[in-house]
Amino acid sequence: MKPMYRSRSWRRKYVRTPGGRVVIHFERRKPKIAHCAICGRPLNGIPRGRPVEMRKLPKTKKRPERPYPHLCPKCMRRVMKEQVRAQIMKG
């Protein structure tokens, strides 16, 4: 095993070959799931992928198509309400 593969930053995947041997394939681990910028809840609609995999996806598959995609729906609604109320008070 190469010294670089001794680190646990590489995921070990055991693969059975057609000859019947079991060999280890080393893969980079997936990044953690995206979280809301305000409350920290996990975000739906954003895939867990390494930058190489994310680059291959179309823009619509990388994030939700709604205002404030970096926020969870609950926080997004709260921010939008605050903005509208601020505009009403100002104007």
Curated annotation (Swiss-Prot):
The keyword Cytoplasm does not apply. One of its GO terms (cellular component) is ribosome. Gene3D superfamilies: 6.20.340.10. PROSITE patterns: RIBOSOMAL_L34E. Pfam families: Ribosomal_L34e. InterPro entries: Ribosomal_eL34, Ribosomal_eL34_C_sf, Ribosomal_eL34_CS, Ribosomal_L34e_arc-type. One of its GO terms (molecular function) is structural constituent of ribosome. Residues 48-71 are annotated as: Disordered. Keywords: Ribonucleoprotein, Ribosomal protein. One of its GO terms (biological process) is translation. It comes from the Archaea. Belongs to the eukaryotic ribosomal protein eL34 family. HAMAP family: Ribosomal_eL34. This is Large ribosomal subunit protein eL34. The lineage of its organism: Archaea, Methanobacteriati, Methanobacteriota, Thermococci, Thermococcales.
